[in-house]
């Protein structure tokens, strides 16, 4: 699901919400989450999962073109850990074959 598909689904699920307002709501939520992660905070959404940061230590890498050794600095990367309810919901579909996205499928 893309951001625009999420906005469209949100607007269709709540008829009083105009598409422009749904887009603003999604954008605001994503901006707030990005800002929190950039400040080093953890985000927990009960029943869904948590977002945090994982530290990748500095290391010696290799330039694939020249083969030259390069120092890669330490960095932090976003990490998502699904919650129990989300894992169970996704696992319930484990035996089902993959199919094209169905906009009417609310699972």
From Swiss-Prot:
One of its GO terms (cellular component) is chromosome. Residues 76-107 are annotated as: Disordered. NCBIfam families: hip (TIGR00988), PRK00199.1 (NF001222). One of its GO terms (biological process) is DNA recombination. It comes from Burkholderia cenocepacia (strain HI2424). GO terms for molecular function: DNA binding; structural constituent of chromatin. Gene3D superfamilies: IHF-like DNA-binding proteins. The keyword Transcription applies. Pfam families: Bac_DNA_binding (PF00216). Keywords: DNA recombination, DNA-binding, Transcription, Transcription regulation, Translation regulation. Heterodimer of an alpha and a beta chain. This is Integration host factor subunit beta. This protein is one of the two subunits of integration host factor, a specific DNA-binding protein that functions in genetic recombination as well as in transcriptional and translational control. Residues 82-101 have a biased composition (Basic and acidic residues). HAMAP family: IHF_beta. SMART domains: BHL. Belongs to the bacterial histone-like protein family. It comes from the Bacteria.
